[in-house]
């Protein structure tokens, strides 16, 4: 479950995706540290300064990712080939980022206390075409961890495993 906790890199990615200014990013970091401390990686729970510093570091990286990634081969040459550059140049930082971003959007960004999406769209984000048991288990673990409740139109609580149609609109709420 450690991988489900927010890291500074996760928050920097969310900041980049949302196009937040530095001032908005600092406010988000403050609120998350104050209100969602139990969801932060252990190293940040008691150290706001490190939390903010690391978020700003990764945010800076996200702003100029292409140029910095281009420098990695020369860094590896200087390190005598002991550094694994491919691990640092990933574009998919974390598949769980979708759920982390969903929680942040609902709690901190939106005027609404919910988000909506079709199950088919959610599956497409992960490259799934069928509602497999592994995918449903993956979803349920994240829904429970992030306290996300799913409902159909009319606030009818639903289970993604037993929904009739993949094209039903799901409402996500943090409870």
Name these PLM-found stretches.
Residues 1-6, 14-15:
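Hydrophobic membrane-targeting and insertion signals
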Residues 14-23, 34-43:
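Charged, low-complexity interaction regions
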Residues 18, 94-101, 131-132:
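Structured alpha/beta or helical-core interaction and ligand-binding surfaces enriched in interleaved
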Residues 35, 39-58, 123-160:
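Charge-enriched amphipathic alpha-helical scaffolds
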Residues 41-97:
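Long, low-complexity, charged/polar intrinsically disordered regions in eukaryotic proteins
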Residues 97-113:
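Short helix->loop/beta-hairpin flanking segments within DNA-binding domains
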Residues 109-130:
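Short glycine-rich, basic-tinged beta-strand/loop micro-motifs
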Residues 156-175:
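C-terminal edge-of-domain segments
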